[in-house]
A protein has these predicted regions:
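Structural core segment of the AMP-binding/adenylate-forming
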Residues: 1-63
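Short hydrophobic/charged patches on amphipathic alpha-helices used for structural packing
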Residues: 10, 77, 89, 162, ...
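Conserved acidic residues
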Residues: 10, 19, 43, 83, ...
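Residue-level detector of structured alpha->beta connecting loops
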Residues: 17, 39, 149, 169-170, ...
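Conserved S/T- and glycine-rich ATP-binding loop of Class I adenylate-forming
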Residues: 21, 85, 91-94, 127, ...
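Conserved pre-ATP/AMP-binding loop-to-beta segment of ANL
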Residues: 47, 52, 67-90, 97, ...
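Conserved AMP-binding A3 loop
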Residues: 86-112
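Conserved AMP-binding/adenylation subdomain of ANL enzymes
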Residues: 109-126, 133-224, 228
Length: 234
């Protein structure tokens, strides 16, 4: 979380016994403070940007290219324990210290598989990443998109949400219930303003009844509303 206070960042690094920290220059002050404090086990600092004082991601990438095929093959042949600890996620910790959720690669892949069993995501779908990737649901949703071969676009901000959905012709959207409720309320506000509430509510009942009989006319019935959301949203 880029907005994490320094104290929580330090505590998380201590509790996780992290040895490597990847950061960007925006958080350089916090990194310098961590190095000076020497309260964590972090011994390797990797900067995502070019830096005279730290190893950069570009530098590591360059070294990897120079290592040669033999070194790459050795790395790729390393044994993987799918059920060993691979990820520690700290919860929000609103009432006390953040709880550390311990996950394995098996847990993560199982989540991706389960989501694909619940919802159909296809190659060619377009997703909009709205939740940050340090948000577990946001990160898992992105892994689902990669697994399915779907494209991912990025929202320009909450005020541009509807504009981006239309502009990018979004077909799949992973988000929290609160955001869906906000979109629904906004749609219903427009429906009431245009005097179409009774017509829409009747359409909802009719389409629900027909759906039970295996007839789906929702996209035709609510085309005008769906067009306001880009026309592709499922």
């Amino acid at each position: 979380d880029k907005g994490l206070p320094y104290e929580e960042l330090e505590t998380s690094l201590v509790r996780s016994e992290a040895e490597v920290l990847i950061f960007d220059t925006e958080h350089l002050a916090a990194v310098e403070q961590l190095r000076a404090a020497q309260t964590t086990k972090v011994s390797t600092f990797i900067c995502m940007d070019a830096s005279a004082d730290y190893v950069s991601v570009a530098q590591l990438r360059s070294e990897a290219k120079q290592a040669g095929e033999a070194e790459l093959a050795r790395y790729q042949a390393l044994p993987i324990d799918a059920k060993a600890l691979a990820l520690i996620i700290f919860t929000s910790g609103t009432t006390s210290l953040a709880k550390a959720v311990m996950l394995s690669q098996y847990n993560i892949v199982e989540n991706v598989y389960a989501l694909q069993c619940c919802e159909n995501v296809y190659r060619g779908d377009v997703n909009m990443a709205f939740l940050p990737y340090h948000h577990t649901f946001g990160a898992t949703g992105q892994l689902v998109m990669l697994a399915a071969g779907a494209a991912t676009t990025y929202c320009d901000g909450l005020k541009y949400l509807q504009k981006n959905i239309v502009e990018y012709r979004i077909s799949v959207f992973f988000c929290v219930p609160l955001l869906i409720e906000a979109i629904y309320k906004r749609i219903m506000m427009t429906v009431k303003k245009e005097g179409l509430e009774r017509k829409v509510r009747f359409g909802l009942k009719l389409s629900g009844l027909l759906l039970r009989c295996g007839i789906d006319i929702r996209r035709k019935l609510f085309k005008q509303i769906l067009d306001q959301l880009g026309g592709n949203l499922r």
